[in-house]
């Protein structure tokens, strides 16, 4: 017996796979990937006072985001959607500062952008809840937002906001 956990896209009816859904899905994946890369680069490159605390904070954030990425892509694929993995080019930034405070601010920017993308995708799912797949994706987006919010609070506390 073979267990096929990936959805055969030819067998799935895809009324939700319209242009709006595609844009929101791909933006969520891209912003999540970019935020994960920025957190990992910050973890590797932080220097100076508060190094150890910031190093651990960035590690927690990229681990949290990595778990979110895995769940998001698996959820989207289970519903018959393949994210555009060509978007995984990274944020396209050069890091010119390595102090903890500046890197925390940079991570805050990326997490806020991610939170916005997740919120917009969640709203789309709520507005189209007649499709049970969107109810499931919406539930997943809501859980993602809670995790992202927790990381935002940690970064803001570190930054003294």
PLM regions: where:
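Helix-loop segments that flank and shape redox-cofactor active sites
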Residues: 35-60, 121-135
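Alpha-helical initiation/capping and key positions within long helical/coiled-coil segments
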Residues: 24-27, 31, 57-60, 64, ...
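Conserved alpha-helical segments that form or flank metal/cofactor-binding pockets of metalloenzymes
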Residues: 52-87
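Acidic, low-complexity proline/glycine-rich segments
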Residues: 2-11, 26-37
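Disorder-to-helix initiation segments
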Residues: 11-28, 100-103, 107-110
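A structural signal for well-ordered alpha-helices, especially hydrophobic packing surfaces
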Residues: 25, 29, 36-39, 43, ...
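Acidic/histidine-rich alpha-helical segments that form the ligand environment
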Residues: 93-146
């Amino acid at each position: 017996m073979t267990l096929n956990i990936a959805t055969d896209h030819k067998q799935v009816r895809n009324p939700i796979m319209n242009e709006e859904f595609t844009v929101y899905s791909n933006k969520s994946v891209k912003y999540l990937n970019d935020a994960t890369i920025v957190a990992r680069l910050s973890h590797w490159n932080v220097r100076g006072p508060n190094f150890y605390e910031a190093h651990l904070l960035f590690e927690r954030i990229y681990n949290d985001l990595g778990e979110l990425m895995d769940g998001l892509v698996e959820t989207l694929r289970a519903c018959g959607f393949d994210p555009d993995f060509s978007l995984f080019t990274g944020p396209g930034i050069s890091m010119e500062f390595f102090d903890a405070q500046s890197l925390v601010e940079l991570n805050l920017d990326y997490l806020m952008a991610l939170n916005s993308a997740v919120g917009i995708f969640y709203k789309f799912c709520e507005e189209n809840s007649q499709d049970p797949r969107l109810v499931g994706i919406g539930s997943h987006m809501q859980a993602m937002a809670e995790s992202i919010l927790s990381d935002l609070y940690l970064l803001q506390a570190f930054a003294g906001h």
